[in-house]
Design a protein with these regions (language model features):
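Bacterial N-terminal signal peptides that target proteins for export
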Residues: 1-11
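Bacterial N-terminal signal peptides
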Residues: 10-19
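Lipolytic serine-hydrolase domain surface
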Residues: 22-58, 115, 123-174, 193-408, ...
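N-terminal carbohydrate-binding/catalytic regions of secreted carbohydrate-active enzymes
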Residues: 56-72
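Short, surface-exposed "cap/lid" segments of acyl-processing enzymes
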Residues: 72-125
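The conserved beta1-alpha1 loop
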Residues: 81-85, 182-183, 220
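Gly/Ala-rich beta-loop-alpha elbow adjacent to hydrolase catalytic centers
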Residues: 181, 185, 189
Length: 420
């Protein structure tokens, strides 16, 4: 009877899972009666939605058409494309949080002074499949597998590339694009960056159009650090020192999902896998089992972390009463400094400090939990202010003192790749 009972339990769990799952249909479909349902207008900016199914296919290709038309019709667009993560979709709280960020950017003096017009593109998928307790938490690995399919199949990358192409084609030299991903969305963003870096390194695309955005940011990415190690090593071998960031991976030390849950799951999975000894990027010639990169995310792997946030324990008066986000967009601060809103209208001074001996345009930033508390705490004002500072550091339109862009199309220095 035991096998029968076990089978019955499995059937019951499966039935409960299926009965509680979210819809497979697009949540913002365009129709004959409402052909622009996937675009919403707000005060001063608009947001377009593009949705993908379980295998990474377009759920409604007209959503992409509408997004591209929006970019094409917007003068001097600042395009922010966002890929959400676990426990979100195109109707979750992430939508309102994303719109709130767009509204703050749209109202910032620095953005208005250079003539940017803010456009948001929200890339949606079923990051959330159930609200049932326990099943909700257990969906982490199921959703990770889905995110990996989205990242490896064609349509998601096609959308990301089409967005940047449209902005650059219609507004050459006047546009700026940002690709932002959270959690499993960060995994998708990182895979997109890897394809682009490889294409530029080998001359398949020139620097003006190779990247999926002018700046790519992943916040608390739920991905192993195998790809991160490979990309950092490739950039290090091309001698990309003293250049502005192209890709910034941000992870809070308080992120339990990627810091605790992720290594437990990948540690169990690693038992059945084989791992070579690989070179950690840098001049130290350190070899380590690749298992270390398979089981840890980039922001929890001390062999890859090359920046940390540091509280300078200084305060400054807010120029013109600006909040930290607006101030960080408006002014440069010494040594990759940035400000956070402090007490009594003052601004606290922090720094994104480079650590270690690997200087590449892939920033792997470990963030203090007072800025980002945990895995989902990415939309608070302190986190947004820090990201705004990174945005200025990497944006030569806003910041004429920005460092030069890295030249990637060059032969590698194999001495930087080989164990000696």
């Amino acid at each position: 009877m035991l096998p029968f009972r076990s089978h019955t339990v499995e059937i019951c769990i499966s039935a409960l899972w299926l009965s509680s799952c979210t819809s497979l249909s697009p949540l913002r479909p365009n129709t004959t009666a409402n052909p622009t349902n996937s675009v919403i207008g707000q005060d001063g900016y608009k947001v377009a939605f593009v949705e993908f199914g379980e295998q990474g296919s377009y759920q409604d290709p007209t959503q992409l058409q509408n997004a591209l038309a929006l970019i094409r019709d917007t003068p001097q667009p600042l395009v922010i494309t966002y890929v959400h993560g676990w426990q979100n979709d195109v109707e979750s709280g992430d939508v309102q949080s994303f719109e709130s960020l767009l509204a703050r950017l749209n109202g910032a003096p620095a953005i208005r002074n250079v003539g940017f017009h803010v456009v948001g593109v929200y890339l949606g998928w079923r990051g959330k499949i159930t609200d049932v307790p326990i099943l909700k938490e257990l969906s982490f690995w199921n959703r990770k597998n889905t995110a990996e399919r989205l990242a490896s199949n064609y349509d998601v990358y096609d959308t990301i590339a089409s967005i940047s192409e449209e902005a650059r084609k219609d507004h050459p030299g006047k546009q700026y694009t940002v690709l932002l991903g959270h959690s499993f969305g960060g995994l998708i963003v990182e895979r997109s960056v890897a394809h682009a870096i490889n294409a530029e390194i080998h001359g398949h695309a020139d620097a003006s159009r190779s990247m999926p955005a002018d700046l790519m940011v992943a916040v608390n990415p739920a991905a192993d650090s195998v790809l991160a190690r490979q990309m950092i090593a490739a950039l290090y071998s091309r001698k990309t020192e003293d250049t502005r960031p192209l890709f910034v991976s941000i992870t809070s030390t308080g992120d339990w999902a990627t810091g605790i849950v992720f290594p437990i799951g990948t540690g169990l999975a690693s038992v059945s896998k084989g791992f070579n000894e690989v070179e950690a990027p840098g001049p130290a010639n350190t070899q380590v089992s690749e298992r270390k990169f398979y089981t840890l995310t980039p922001g929890h792997n001390e062999m890859l972390i090359n920046h940390i946030t540091v509280d300078k324990h200084e305060t400054i008066n807010s120029p013109n009463g600006l909040h930290a986000l607006e101030e960080n967009l408006q002014h440069n601060h010494v040594g990759n400094g940035f400000t956070l809103d402090g007490a009594e209208g003052k601004l606290d001074v922090w720094q994104i400090k480079r650590v270690g001996d690997v200087d590449v345009p892939y920033w792997d930033v470990q963030v203090d939990p007072s800025i980002i508390k945990d895995h989902g705490d990415i939309w608070n004002e302190r986190a947004e202010a820090m990201v705004a500072a990174i945005f200025r550091m990497a944006n030569p339109i806003l910041n004429r003192s920005a460092k030069p862009r890295a030249t990637l199309h060059r032969a590698p220095d194999f001495n930087r790749l080989e164990h000696r």
